[in-house]
């Protein structure tokens, strides 16, 4: 097989951008219009607040079909609009030729200048939810302004409506349609500004990558000059005068605001206080600035340089806070975000990391809500010498399991990172639960980090994941969730595509559009769940990745996106995609059920055993796509039921359906089984019907790869190794089946799993 030439992907992208630009330039030569002339007095004096509500919606062309010339011509003929009003306003004030003749930095300054000139007080408002609220003042005003007109409209059409409705509901529907369109446009505009600001002002990329952007811009400038010269027969002097961009009067007036990059950063990220987190080492050393790990670990007895802890915030520096923070980040390590309720899990996790011989530093991100006594418990678990081992250790050690560390397990380098002061006081109450994982991805001080939950169970050492081929290739490695047939509207995917970069973003600022690499994933086709965020691998220093982290945090505030997801899960990879960053990889397998196979005699009360094998477990496990068997990690702790301490066992014994071997047992036996370590002998990655349809059959085999059960506070899921069967009642009927992945582990692997489970629960 012939290997692709290095840089081929970049070359293809450059060619696509040049072709797209050439189409636009052909359009310029064919259609002449005065409204884009930058010296036109009307354009100079004309200002539009693109955030101002409007009830008319011109046809919008997304320009996403490979910059198709026919689409551009049709759009132009019908008074076309760009996907984002940010560009619509820019090209009302300036000709396309004059803008494309600018350098990259000039384009950045012009666009920001143009945005602020339309609304001097522009700021991204985290308090704006974009939610439809029928009790709001806005809705009352809408009724006052539009009520009479809508009443007349309703009287005309009410008898022809497919579904009968009241006037009140009709007005609500009309309000929802209008506001939804407005909110959608406003979100598109805000995300466009966010991407452009990050691309222009947040350091991102190596010199080679920046040189590539410069070459693209230079090629565009050559095409602009050539196209205009050929179309108009103008001299070089005439052409130079034409292409010279002139600022509007409003743009001239906001020079000071545009040149103040620190203030610009505060406009885009007002929820960030511009203060660094507070870093506290296990030994009591503290820092108001990201610690330099190379310096600290070089000589533990050498005092640290005082100047690194003297800077309280970034306002003493003219540069943008986020650039300072990115530049100060260093090293690689493990990151987790916890509160007081996660302390026990964190202690168990640290014991597990010691058993895995982890030597990477650990940053525990918190929001001013961990007590000193809890810190002391964590430090004790991380630092005290371990002399006792579970009985299962001997069996594993003598079995020559290579992953078991020598005795004693190494102490852990634990840091506590308080991010409370890094969030503006007026916005602190906007963050809750899963949001802190997104903040942890931003405010940890590592260049490379593994973000995990307190109840994440690693079955490989952390270094294994940093060395994984998928992570090494992309600097962003993710894992898929379970794949039950829980669906979402197809319109969710269509909405997300609109939120991504358009071709004009790509032409103007080299921000790539979404491709089928993203849009062909199951979430865009209607699957409810896609990513499991219990373990996330990201390298901040890779091109665009830091900006993608910023995007995923910003998406949290955009409720039409965040509220359609399950917690934080999907915001990680969608933050990448919406940022124009598809340099990420997923493990190919969806999550597995891990544990022990259900015995045939207990399966569905059938006389004939099912072909499909079953595992009922509360733990989503992740099987390597490199060998289709290695268990890499799983979630929900190492007890059989992570909710063991929160269950009414009297009720559990009465309502038990799937764990029939426990029927008739005393509730205390139930509790012991739930509290003991999960024993793993098998794993099942269920099949997924590509049409997301159940496979009904006459064999009474499972129709779906997953079923949810009430056990373990409804955290229990049963997985099946195959689905489908006979499509008719006759024995000879055609069979439609799908097989998943069934893994049976060796005695050595099972012994190793048992050892790690005993370590995690503290079974010594």
Swiss-Prot record:
Q: Which domain of life is it from?
A: Eukaryota
Q: What topology does it adopt in the membrane?
A: Single-pass type II membrane protein
Question: According to the UniProt topology, which residue ranges lie Lumenal?
Answer: 35-764
Q: Name one GO cellular component term.
A: Golgi apparatus
Q: Which SUPFAM superfamilies match?
A: Nucleotide-diphospho-sugar transferases
**Which biological pathway?**
Protein modification; protein glycosylation
Instruction: Give the E.C. number(s).
Output: 2.4.1.-
Q: Which UniProt keywords apply?
A: Glycoprotein, Glycosyltransferase, Golgi apparatus, Membrane, Signal-anchor, Transferase, Transmembrane, Transmembrane helix
**Family recorded in the similarity comment:** Belongs to the MNN1/MNT family.
PANTHER family xref list: ALPHA-1,3-MANNOSYLTRANSFERASE MNN1-RELATED
Q: What is this protein called?
A: Putative alpha-1,3-mannosyltransferase MNN13
Q: Which organism is it from?
A: Candida albicans (strain SC5314 / ATCC MYA-2876) (Yeast)
């Amino acid at each position: 097989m012939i290997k692709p030439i290095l840089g081929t992907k970049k070359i293809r992208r450059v060619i696509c951008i040049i072709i797209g630009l050439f189409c636009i330039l052909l359009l310029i030569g064919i259609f002449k219009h005065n409204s884009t002339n930058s010296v036109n007095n009307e354009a100079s004096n004309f200002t539009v607040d693109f955030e101002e509500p409007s009830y008319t919606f011109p046809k919008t062309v997304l320009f996403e079909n490979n910059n198709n010339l026919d689409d551009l011509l049709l759009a132009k003929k019908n008074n076309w609009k760009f996907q984002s009003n940010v560009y619509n306003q820019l090209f009302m004030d300036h000709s396309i030729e004059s803008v494309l003749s600018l350098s990259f930095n000039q384009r950045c300054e012009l666009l920001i200048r143009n945005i602020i000139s339309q609304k001097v007080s522009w700021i991204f408002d985290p308090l704006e939810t974009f939610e439809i609220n029928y009790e709001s003042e806005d809705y009352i005003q809408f009724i006052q302004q539009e009520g009479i007109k809508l009443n007349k409209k309703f009287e005309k059409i009410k008898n022809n409506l497919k579904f009968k409705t009241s006037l009140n509901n009709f007005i609500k529907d009309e309000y929802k349609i209008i506001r939804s369109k407005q909110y959608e446009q406003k979100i598109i505009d805000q995300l466009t500004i966010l991407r452009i600001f990050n691309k222009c002002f947040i350091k991102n990329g190596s010199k080679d990558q920046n040189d590539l952007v410069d070459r693209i811009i230079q090629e565009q400038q050559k095409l602009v000059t050539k196209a205009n010269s050929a179309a108009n027969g103008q001299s070089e002097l005439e052409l130079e005068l034409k292409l010279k961009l002139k600022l509007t009067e409003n743009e001239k007036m906001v020079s000071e605001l545009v040149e103040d990059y620190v203030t610009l950063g505060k406009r885009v990220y007002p929820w960030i206080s511009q203060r660094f987190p507070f870093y506290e080492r296990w030994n009591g050393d503290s820092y108001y600035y990201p610690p330099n790990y190379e310096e600290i670990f070089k000589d533990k007895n050498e005092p640290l340089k005082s100047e690194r802890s003297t800077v309280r915030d970034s306002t003493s520096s003219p540069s943008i806070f986020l650039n300072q923070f990115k530049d100060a980040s260093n090293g690689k390590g493990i990151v987790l975000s916890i509160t007081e309720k996660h302390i026990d899990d964190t202690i168990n996790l640290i014991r597990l990391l010691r058993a895995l011989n982890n030597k990477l530093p650990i940053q525990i991100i918190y929001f001013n809500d961990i007590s000193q006594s809890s810190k002391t418990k964590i430090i004790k678990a991380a630092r005290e010498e371990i002399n006792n081992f579970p009985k299962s250790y001997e069996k594993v050690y003598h079995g020559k399991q290579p992953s078991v560390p020598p005795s004693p397990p190494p102490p852990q380098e634990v840091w506590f990172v308080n991010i409370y002061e890094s969030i503006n006081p007026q916005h602190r109450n906007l963050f809750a639960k899963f949001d802190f994982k997104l903040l942890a991805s931003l405010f940890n001080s590592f260049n490379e980090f593994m973000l995990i939950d307190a109840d994440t169970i690693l079955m490989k050492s952390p270094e294994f994941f940093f060395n994984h081929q998928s992570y090494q290739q992309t600097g962003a490695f993710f894992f898929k969730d379970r794949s039950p047939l829980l669906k979402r509207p197809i319109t969710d995917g269509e909405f997300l595509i609109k939120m991504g970069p358009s071709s004009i973003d790509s032409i103007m600022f080299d921000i790539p559009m979404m491709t089928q690499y993203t849009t062909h994933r199951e979430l865009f086709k209607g699957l409810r769940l896609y990513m499991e965020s219990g373990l996330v691998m990201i390298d901040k220093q890779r091109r665009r990745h830091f900006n993608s982290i910023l995007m995923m945090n910003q998406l949290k505030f955009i409720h039409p996106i965040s509220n359609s997801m399950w917690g934080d899960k999907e915001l990680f990879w969608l933050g990448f995609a919406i940022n124009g960053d598809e340099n990420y990889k997923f493990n190919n397998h969806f999550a597995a059920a891990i544990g022990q196979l259900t015995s045939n005699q207990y399966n569905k009360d059938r006389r004939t055993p099912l072909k499909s094998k079953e595992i009922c477990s509360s733990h989503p496990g992740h099987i390597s796509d490199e060998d289709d068997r290695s268990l890499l990690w799983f979630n929900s702790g190492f007890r059989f039921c992570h909710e063991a301490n929160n269950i009414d066992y009297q009720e559990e014994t009465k309502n038990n359906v799937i764990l029939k071997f426990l029927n008739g047992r005393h509730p205390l036996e139930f509790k012991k089984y739930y509290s003991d370590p999960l024993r793993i002998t098998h794993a099942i990655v269920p099949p997924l019907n590509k049409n997301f349809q159940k496979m009904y059959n006459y064999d009474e085999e499972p129709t779906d790869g997953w079923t949810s059960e009430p056990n373990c506070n409804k955290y229990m899921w049963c997985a099946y190794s195959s689905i489908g069967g006979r499509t008719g009642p006759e024995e000879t009927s055609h069979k439609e089946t799908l097989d998943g992945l069934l893994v049976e582990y060796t005695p050595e692997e099972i012994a190793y799993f048992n050892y790690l489970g005993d370590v995690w629960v503290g079974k010594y």
